[in-house]
Amino acid sequence: KLDPARTALLTLDFQKGILGFVSGAEAVIPNAAKAVEFARRKQYQIIHVGLGFSTGHPEIPEHSPFNRRVKQNNLFVKGTPSAEFHDSIARPGELVVFKQRVGAFSENQLHLILRARGIEHLVFFGISTSGITLSTLRRAFDLDFRCVVLKDACFDADPEVHRILTEKVFPAQAKVLTVDAFIAEQEA
């Protein structure tokens, strides 16, 4: 069982702008919401990580792949609807950490916040499995966090990529469970 005082649940890119853009991603919201509710009940630290830019996107260089998708469409400016988290995932007052690239630890204070709070275990899930979830797992593992990925609260536009990552790649660096299996394990 995980020590709630040493555990953080990270929701990764469950933002309205991503959910509206990635077809099919809303299918994992019930599982994600169930995981968040469990974490609240267990009093895990909950941190919502997502894209957040300044007005005009000065953080994005012209040559960046983000330029076409984000800057040119004026997406994920902090305080705008596309940067908001889905209502069933985030509550007012819960910690939000913005990033400017793919991984949850990219260009922000997430690592400092986790260490300051004595966090050793990370439980997380995101949209997409091959984007933020993969990047976050790699970095968290390198930073010596013990990780759990909740596979049925992750989504990837390519189901085969999702399957390969959750069945063959992630298990080398994390425990990979369904939300129900994780809850059952923690309640046992």
Where in this protein do the model-derived segments appear?
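…and closely analogous acidic/polar surface helices at protein-protein or active-site interfaces
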Residues: 22-39
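Short acidic, Gly/Ser-rich segments with clustered Asp/Glu that frequently serve as metal-coordination loops
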Residues: 15-20
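Active-site loop/turn elements of alpha/beta-hydrolase fold enzymes
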Residues: 14, 51-53, 152
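Short, flexible, mixed-charge acidic loops at enzyme active sites
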Residues: 59-66
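Short hydrophobic beta-strand that contains or immediately precedes a catalytic carboxylate
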Residues: 10-12
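Von Willebrand factor
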Residues: 39-58
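Active-site-adjacent betaalpha module
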Residues: 1-8, 34-42, 68-188
